[in-house]
């Protein structure tokens, strides 16, 4: 269910704005998206796992807040981010 450190590093390198950037909204959204995808796969086999479902909903909410922040600050950056991540919004 969690992301391996190697996968997290590749996400940080791919979405970082500059070298050493681990906290930008783009990086945070990319990591949250990866975790959301993993949990969605988990729920295909564990339908009744409601405790993890709550965590999923919190992650989706956090990602939504970060995406709204990016959209309010810089809309072209927001559009490129959701396109790169494949988020349907």
Swiss-Prot record:
GO terms, biological process: translation
Instruction: Please give the coiled-coil regions recorded for this protein.
Output: none
Name a GO molecular-function annotation: structural constituent of ribosome
Q: Which UniProt keywords apply?
A: Ribonucleoprotein, Ribosomal protein, RNA-binding, rRNA-binding
**A Pfam family reported for this protein in Swiss-Prot or TrEMBL:** Ribosomal_S15
CDD domains named in the record: Ribosomal_S15p_S13e
Highest taxon above the source species? Bacteria
Mind telling me which InterPro entries this protein's record contains?
Ribosomal_uS15, Ribosomal_uS15_bac-type, uS15_NS1_RNA-bd_sf
**Function recorded in the entry:** One of the primary rRNA binding proteins, it binds directly to 16S rRNA where it helps nucleate assembly of the platform of the 30S subunit by binding and bridging several RNA helices of the 16S rRNA.
Q: Which PANTHER family match?
A: RIBOSOMAL PROTEIN S15, BACTERIAL AND ORGANELLAR, SMALL RIBOSOMAL SUBUNIT PROTEIN US15M
Family assignment from sequence similarity: Belongs to the universal ribosomal protein uS15 family.
Name of the molecule in the record: Small ribosomal subunit protein uS15
* Species in which this protein is naturally found: Methylocella silvestris (strain DSM 15510 / CIP 108128 / LMG 27833 / NCIMB 13906 / BL2)
Gene name tied to this protein: rpsO
């Amino acid at each position: 269910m969690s992301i391996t450190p190697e996968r997290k590093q590749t996400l940080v390198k791919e979405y970082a704005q500059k070298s050493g950037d681990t906290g930008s909204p783009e990086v945070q959204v990319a990591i949250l998206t990866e975790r959301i995808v993993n949990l969605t796969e988990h729920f295909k086999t564990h339908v009744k796992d409601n405790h993890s479902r709550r965590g999923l909903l919190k992650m989706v909410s956090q990602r939504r807040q970060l995406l709204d922040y990016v959209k309010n600050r810089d809309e072209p950056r927001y559009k490129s981010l959701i396109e790169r991540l494949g988020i349907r919004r």
